[in-house]
Amino acid sequence: MADINPTRMELLKLKTKIKLAQKGHKLLKQKRDALIMEFFEILDQASGIRDKVNNALEKAYKDLIMAQAVMGTLSVQEISYASKNDNIVLDLDTRNIMGVTVPVLEIENVKRTMADRGYGPYGVSSKLDEAAKEFEEALELIMELAEIETSIKLLAEEIITTKRRVNALEYVVIPRMAEMQKYIGMRLDEMERENFFRLKLIKARIDAREEA
């Protein structure tokens, strides 16, 4: 600490810096805690939606296999190609969670009627239509899951960054400034004592001369 200037002005500046650092530390801790709460809430949502996606896909593949068994694989493929959906629209927006920008995905025109898919109830297994409905539902859920999982990743990164900043302030920056404050206070006390003894010595010499 040899490069520190032990003056009262420096001590005042340091006290102000410590107060600001402590305030920043408190705000960052609040942000960290709020982010963690939000993170776990979204994590719970992801778990539920992931289960829904798996269930929808499982049902869809079962119905597809049954449709292939009834109609034949080639017929199912021909109908699938003919009923291709070119009207799906994906909109991307964003929202802010505690300073973190996360995506908002919106998918439109996914679910269709049998007529929209280009086939009728005759000559087509009901299982194929059920499979189509379930795949459409799964696609909407997959988009919702993608939005949530991306948000989880971004929040986790921000939590790690915020934790590092909290720890840096708590264990490095604030303690270091507190040590500097203590050092300057001690040096000022020493300097005051030295000045006091110096003045006392000067006064004693003056008194001695006057008596002589």
Swiss-Prot record:
One of its GO terms (molecular function) is proton-transporting ATPase activity, rotational mechanism. The keyword Transport applies. It comes from the Archaea. GO terms for biological process: proton motive force-driven plasma membrane ATP synthesis. Keywords: ATP synthesis, Cell membrane, Hydrogen ion transport, Ion transport, Membrane, Transport. It is found in: Cell membrane. It is a peripheral membrane protein. InterPro entries: V_ATPase_D. GO terms for cellular component: plasma membrane. It holds the Pfam family ATP-synt_D. Signal peptide: none annotated. Has multiple subunits with at least A(3), B(3), C, D, E, F, H, I and proteolipid K(x). Component of the A-type ATP synthase that produces ATP from ADP in the presence of a proton gradient across the membrane. Belongs to the V-ATPase D subunit family. This is A-type ATP synthase subunit D.
